[in-house]
Amino acid sequence: EKGIPYLVVYNKIDLLSTEKIKDLAMSVRAEEVLVSASDGMNIQELKEKIASLKPEDTHKYPLIQDLIEPLDLVILVVPIDKAAPKGRLILPQQQTIRDILERGALSLVVRDTELKSTLDHFLAQGVCPKLVVTDSQAFARVSKAVPENITLTSFSILFSRYKGELEIQLKGIAALSSIEDGDRILIAEGCTHHRQCGDIGTCKMPEWIRNYTRKKPVFEFTSGTEFPDDVSSYKMVVHCGGCMLNEREMKYRIACCQDQGVPITNYGILIAQVTGILRRSLGPFPEMQKLI
């Protein structure tokens, strides 16, 4: 039902007679293997079976490669604030750069403070970026700086599509318009970073939701592996992009919400909604614009 691959391993077959082992070997199914940890019997076969359990790449879409052509210019907007890690880019930014490189396109990484001058420089030379991808927190500022004829989206929205969740999470944002005082909202993050002043999950997200809805919902927060099995008491769930979670865990969390009839959306979609640029942020995906 869950589509989880498995093996049944029978150990200590060295304690059985040769004839008994032969009899068992004739009846084992494909997902069963007979081994002996003490003398190594069939251990290599076990390793090969474990390796064969690795699922094929289930991503329906690439991260960004299908949106660009070789030598296209893609500008990535990466704010450097108190929450940014020292000396490195975060995982979604790294993965996006790698995907652009594999396509043979050009990636240019700038801070939001240098974005306008960067765009002016290239446009003055007749070079128009194919796409601008921004950190969701800078959506409002970046949207004002990027001309309407240049496609704009966010890392969060790219990853939502990449993991096959964009349509579900777009539909989930509709719950924001029906929030009332006292409604419970779960804000969930996949990583366990040390929270700082102005943290997006515990500080900025609640403030954006209160300002947008003009209501006073009750916020609860989880991080890492704390995601509850029972989410039925929540009006909606707002999840991070899930870059630190594997695909199976993220799909499990979404399935929990769907099974219990609880709308789920993600940070990037919510930020785009409250800043009034959700439709524009879906520019690379016109089929998704029809859902809002």
Where are these regions (language model features)?
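C-terminal effector/interaction modules appended to NTPase cores
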Residues: 87-292
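Canonical P-loop GTPase G-domain recognition
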Residues: 2-66, 73-78, 82, 104-114, ...
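Amphipathic, alpha-helical segments enriched in basic
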Residues: 68, 72-76, 184, 232
